[in-house]
Regions:
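Conserved acidic segment of CheY-like receiver
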Residues: 4-14, 19-23
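Active-site beta3 strand of CheY-like receiver
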Residues: 6, 49-59
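Helix N-cap/capping motif at the beta->alpha junctions
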Residues: 34-47, 69
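Receiver (REC) domain active-site loop signature in two-component systems and cognate sites
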Residues: 64
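Short amphipathic alpha-helix used as the core "switch/output" element in two-component signaling
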Residues: 70-83
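A Lys-centered signature of the CheY-like receiver
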Residues: 115-116
Length: 127
């Protein structure tokens, strides 16, 4: 299923802009939403309306203030299955820590780990 929306959660607005450009370069009609505050992103996702079956790609930074990407995933794990089934989570990080990569691979709700920067080739691999 082709994703209907790309959501980026990263406290760095410059990275969010770069993600937007890479995504729109590969998927010109992509719906894009960016959050610099992971709590607001989580509120948005957890309030997703019932009956909305659209698929969303969620690109999640690891190192953020207040909530890390791992905190976000921990709370996401507790959401209703109907909501979780609409999201494919990818950790998008500049971290070169192998523990982060391993943790992403072991998480049941994280599809993959992607190193920054997001490029149009990496976007293509998500589709």
């Amino acid at each position: 299923m082709m994703p209907s929306r790309f959501i980026v959660v990263d406290n760095d607005p410059v990275n969010n802009l770069l993600c937007d450009l890479a995504i729109r370069d590969e998927v010109s009609d992509a719906k894009f939403l960016a959050f610099t505050d992971p709590l607001k992103a989580f509120d948005h996702i957890s309030a997703a309306g019932e009956g909305n079956n659209s698929m969303n790609i969620l690109l999640l930074d690891i190192n953020m203030p207040i909530w890390s990407g791992w905190d976000f995933v921990e709370h996401f794990d507790k959401l209703d299955e109907e909501i979780k089934s609409r999201f494919r989570i990818y950790m998008l990080s500049s971290s070169i820590d192998n523990n982060d990569k391993q943790r992403a691979m072991e998480s049941k709700n994280v599809v993959d780990y992607i190193e920054k920067p997001l490029t149009k080739e990496k976007v293509f691999s998500l589709l």
